[in-house]
């Protein structure tokens, strides 16, 4: 027993030092050196202060802002420490009720808008924290935002088109808009 205890303790201490201290600090240092913005959380700053992350959705509720996808994190929306989908199946009555409620809220915010509501405005992403919406979802909200900000719809559309990003590698996903970036651009205009 004594002959195996000392080597086991030494191996335990060495692996703890290597895997628990040296490796994490080395990878963090390399990450900060090679990808400084991403290693710090992809923070978006305005006037020297962090206003959000380009990777985590935020809950915009004012009608003068574009709204992102619903958050599936609970009990607080857009809580990065509680990331995950709702795990509700497509026939689950709770999901159907939530989607109907979100559709009703969108229609109440812009009663004159008769267009079909884009699916990404009423369903949460797999992480529950998606910072982006489809261009179609931005166009759907465009009349409300333009009216609330007393802007021409064409001006808001031009802003959406300028900020939108194409499909990843030309064919993955769809064209998308980062909601935080778009709302900050609206505030700076």
From Swiss-Prot:
It is a single-pass membrane protein. One of its GO terms (molecular function) is P-type potassium transmembrane transporter activity. One of its GO terms (cellular component) is plasma membrane. The keyword Chaperone does not apply. InterPro entries: KdpC. Keywords: ATP-binding, Cell inner membrane, Cell membrane, Ion transport, Membrane, Nucleotide-binding, Potassium, Potassium transport, Transmembrane, Transmembrane helix, Transport. The chain crosses the membrane at residues 10-30. Disulfide bonds: none annotated. The keyword Heme does not apply. It comes from the Bacteria. Part of the high-affinity ATP-driven potassium transport (or Kdp) system, which catalyzes the hydrolysis of ATP coupled with the electrogenic transport of potassium into the cytoplasm. This subunit acts as a catalytic chaperone that increases the ATP-binding affinity of the ATP-hydrolyzing subunit KdpB by the formation of a transient KdpB/KdpC/ATP ternary complex. The system is composed of three essential subunits: KdpA, KdpB and KdpC. This is Potassium-transporting ATPase KdpC subunit. It comes from Janthinobacterium sp. (strain Marseille). The gene is kdpC.
């Amino acid at each position: 027993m004594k002959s195996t205890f000392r080597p086991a303790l030494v191996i335990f201490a060495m692996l703890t030092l290597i895997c628990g201290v040296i490796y994490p600090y080395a990878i963090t240092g390399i990450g900060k050196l090679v990808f400084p913005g991403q290693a710090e959380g992809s923070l978006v700053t305005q006037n020297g202060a962090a206003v959000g992350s380009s990777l985590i959705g935020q809950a915009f509720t004012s009608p003068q802002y574009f709204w992102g996808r619903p958050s599936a994190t609970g009990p607080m929306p857009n809580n990065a420490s509680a990331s995950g989908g709702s795990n509700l199946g497509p026939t689950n009555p709770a999901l159907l009720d939530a989607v109907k409620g979100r559709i009703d809220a969108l229609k109440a915010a812009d009663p004159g808008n008769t267009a079909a509501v884009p699916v990404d405005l009423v369903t949460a992403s797999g992480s529950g924290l998606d910072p982006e919406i489809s261009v179609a979802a931005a166009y759907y909200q465009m009349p409300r935002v333009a009216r609330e900000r007393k802007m021409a719809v064409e001006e808001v559309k031009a802003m959406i088109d300028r900020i939108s990003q194409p499909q990843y590698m030309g064919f993955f996903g769809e064209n998308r808009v980062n909601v935080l970036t778009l709302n900050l651009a609206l505030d700076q205009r």
